[in-house]
């Protein structure tokens, strides 16, 4: 790692730097901890290190008080996030995932997430190794889906443009593989891989890995379903005559912040320019290595790429990337994002295959009373001759359905509540992170609050005679922002039980950050405020003017232009 550079932050390193450095390339004492059946937890440094293996230690917060009363430790378990570049799963993989969730997890569900992958929640220590081995048997792992590394690489779920999508997906996979940790720790611990007397080497990530998490996407305009401005590194596909010719590169987006700390803020990604397809991996590596060396290892709250760009300057960072990669950025090519939502229902691809996008509220695949979604997905997997594609909007695409299978897939989907003809536009445009009871960071409800909140919002829209319209509405249980509220027209950020900060003024395309309108208010007050504003929008909007554009034009809220300067102003 470079240490004599003027852009390196000097000072006492954060403790995470110590634990990564002492971890023996992410091994720690995880293997020994696994054998300790006196606690369901991973202790000491291992609590953090398991994240690099794709897991977070959690407990059921609904049960904490009762278990404490019984003198029991919290119900410790792990959440696993799988590595699925571009979110593609084969039917036989789905069936293995379904079986494990049903038999070996506390909640029995498959949770599709905003990172275009799935999560198992509530896996107890005795089942953790089995979980990794089960996934490995069907060609899936969870390496580097958490921790200070490049996380799961997202790719636009666009089955219409089959040729470009296929190329973009292949690049998402190549980027993911190229930036993966090279340590053998994962295979040794979880897959009983042979322990070789070799010296691990991390040529890209370095022995201390990255200063903080790093997120990458491949986006295919006009769809911004991956929300590029929530990510550190974005490759915007530029195609000519149906062929991918290169990417515009956007660097330094991110939504996380800390309540009360104005040195933290959401930030849109900066456009570095255009590159040819063949330069993709060189640029990806150079951006990562520059952030590795220049990122803040002293203060983790200011360690992400977005803060590095603010501190060193966009042009300095860009010049360093060009120097390290040997690639000069060209002028950005023209593109436009027009929407972010998934096309719910059937569409036909240019290859003649059919694709069915299923709306999964909150991404939670479970058998509900009268709506056995999980069973339905498994039944489809048994007969499906294509693949499944998870979307960054937490929905599921049954992709590549043959003509002869189409009617059967639809029949199964309808019989299990996976197709709802009366689904409102508002429900399709609403999203929440997991939050309570499993997320240890959640300050307020998100997933469990969203369905009722959307029903109330639907009522407000109907009251003002605009039931057919919708607003990008997102709820996140804490300011880390997994629900991507900071790119919504209406964004709620959890502040405490039943309390949220209400942000307004994002846009439908995901290219504007919303500003705080009211702080720390309850659910009823939120709806009261929205009732008034939506009423004004219904009466005074210009033709086809979105809610986010309306509240800015009419001065309800100021536009965030440069979040480093005006997000809190």
Curated annotation (Swiss-Prot):
Catalytic activity: hydrogen sulfide + 3 NADP(+) + 3 H2O = sulfite + 3 NADPH + 4 H(+)
Residues given in the record as [4Fe-4S] cluster binding sites: 433, 439, 478, 482
Free-text remark on how the cofactor is bound: Binds 1 siroheme per subunit. Binds 1 [4Fe-4S] cluster per subunit.
Keyword Secreted: no
Gene Ontology molecular-function annotations: 4 iron, 4 sulfur cluster binding; heme binding; metal ion binding; NADP binding; sulfite reductase (ferredoxin) activity; sulfite reductase (NADPH) activity
Signal peptide (residue range): none
Entry function: Component of the sulfite reductase complex that catalyzes the 6-electron reduction of sulfite to sulfide. This is one of several activities required for the biosynthesis of L-cysteine from sulfate.
Subunit structure: Alpha(8)-beta(8). The alpha component is a flavoprotein, the beta component is a hemoprotein.
Record-stated family: Belongs to the nitrite and sulfite reductase 4Fe-4S domain family.
HAMAP family named among the record's database cross-references: CysI (MF_01540)
Protein name: Sulfite reductase [NADPH] hemoprotein beta-component
Taxonomic lineage: Bacteria, Pseudomonadati, Pseudomonadota, Gammaproteobacteria, Alteromonadales
């Amino acid at each position: 790692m470079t240490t004599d550079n003027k852009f390196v932050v000097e000072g006492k390193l954060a403790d995470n730097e110590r634990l990564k450095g002492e971890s023996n390339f992410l091994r720690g004492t995880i293997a020994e901890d696994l054998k300790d059946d006196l606690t369901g937890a991973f202790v000491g440094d291992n609590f953090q290190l398991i994240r690099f293996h794709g897991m977070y230690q959690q407990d059921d917060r609904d049960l904490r008080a009762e278990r404490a009363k019984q003198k029991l430790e919290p119900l410790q378990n792990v959440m696993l996030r799988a590595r699925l570049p571009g979110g593609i799963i084969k039917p036989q993989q789905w069936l293995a995932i379904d079986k494990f969730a049903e038999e070996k997890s506390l909640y029995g569900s498959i949770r599709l997430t905003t990172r275009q992958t799935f999560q198992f929640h509530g896996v107890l220590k005795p089942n953790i190794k089995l979980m990794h081995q089960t996934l490995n048997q069907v060609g899936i792992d969870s390496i580097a889906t958490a921790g200070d590394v490049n996380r799961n690489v997202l790719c636009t779920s666009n089955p219409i443009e089959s040729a470009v999508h296929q190329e973009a997906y292949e690049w998402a996979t190549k980027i993911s593989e190229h930036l993966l940790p090279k340590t053998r720790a994962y295979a040794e611990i979880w897959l009983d891989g042979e322990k070789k007397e070799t010296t691990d080497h991390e040529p890209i990530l370095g022995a201390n890995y990255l200063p903080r998490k790093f997120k990458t996407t491949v986006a295919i305009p006009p769809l911004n379903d991956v929300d590029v401005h929530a990510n550190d590194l974005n490759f915007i596909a530029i195609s000519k005559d149906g062929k991918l010719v290169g990417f515009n590169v956007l660097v330094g987006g991110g939504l996380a912040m800390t309540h009360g700390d104005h040195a933290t803020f959401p930030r849109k990604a900066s456009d570095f320019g255009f590159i040819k397809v063949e330069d993709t991996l060189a640029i990806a590596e150079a951006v990562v290595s520059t952030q590795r060396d220049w990122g803040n290892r002293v203060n983790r709250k200011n360690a992400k790429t977005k803060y590095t760009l603010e501190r060193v300057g966009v042009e300095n960072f860009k010049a360093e990337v060009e120097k390290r990669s040997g690639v000069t950025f060209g002028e950005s090519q023209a593109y436009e994002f027009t929407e972010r939502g998934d096309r719910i229902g059937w569409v036909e691809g240019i290859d003649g295959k059919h694709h069915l996008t299923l709306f999964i509220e909150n991404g939670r695949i479970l058998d509900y009373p009268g709506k056995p979604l999980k069973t339905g997905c498994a039944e489809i997997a048994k007969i499906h001759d294509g693949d499944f594609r998870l979307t960054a909007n937490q929905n599921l695409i049954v992709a590549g359905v043959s003509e002869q299978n189409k009617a059967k897939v639809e029949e199964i989907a309808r019989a299990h509540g996976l197709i709802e003809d009366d689904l409102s536009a508002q429900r399709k445009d609403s999203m929440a992170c997991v939050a309570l009871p499993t997320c240890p960071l959640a300050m307020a409800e998100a997933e469990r609050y969203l369905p009722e909140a959307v029903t109330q919002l639907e009522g407000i829209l109907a009251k003002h005679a605009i039931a057919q319209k919708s607003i990008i509405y997102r709820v996140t249980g804490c300011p880390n922002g997994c629900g991507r509220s900071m790119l919504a027209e209406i964004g709620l950020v959890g502040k405490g039980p039943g309390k949220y900060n209400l942000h307004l003024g994002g846009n439908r395309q995901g290219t504007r950050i919303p500003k705080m309108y009211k702080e720390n208010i309850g659910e009823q007050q939120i709806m009261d405020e929205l009732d008034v504003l939506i009423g004004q929008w219904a009466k005074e909007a210009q033709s086809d003017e979105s809610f986010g554009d309306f509240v800015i034009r009419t001065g309800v809220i100021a536009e965030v232009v440069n979040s480093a300067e005006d997000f809190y102003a």
